[in-house]
Design a protein with these regions (language model features):
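A short alpha-helix capping/helix-coil boundary motif
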Residues: 7-9, 29-30
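A generic, residue-level signal for flexible/boundary positions that often mark functional hotspots
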Residues: 12, 38, 50, 77-78
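A short, surface-exposed loop/turn module that caps and links secondary-structure elements
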Residues: 31-53
Length: 84
């Protein structure tokens, strides 16, 4: 089963602001996790329960994995100092 990545408007806006090299790294990483999105991510806790984090160098991608629809909803992207 392959999941589909669906970016939110906030994710798309912040993604466009990133350096082209970083964008390429993030795209490549997200394409690799579509087969098994929980294998490399980490579940978040507290006020972000139900969301997952992917670590890509100094950047983080926050997602919500929807198993019933096979969707990875990309919520936020940014440098680790700014994302939480």
């Amino acid at each position: 089963m392959t999941y589909k990545i669906v970016p939110t408007p906030k994710f798309a806006k912040n993604f466009k602001k990133l350096d082209p090299f970083v964008r390429k790294q993030i795209k490549s990483y997200l394409n690799r996790v579509t087969e098994n999105p929980r294998a490399k991510g980490k579940a978040l806790v507290a006020n972000r329960t139900g969301q997952w984090r992917y670590r890509i160098g100094a950047y983080r991608v926050i997602v919500n994995i929807q198993d019933d629809e096979l969707i990875i909803l990309a919520l936020e992207v940014g440098h680790r100092r700014d994302i939480y």
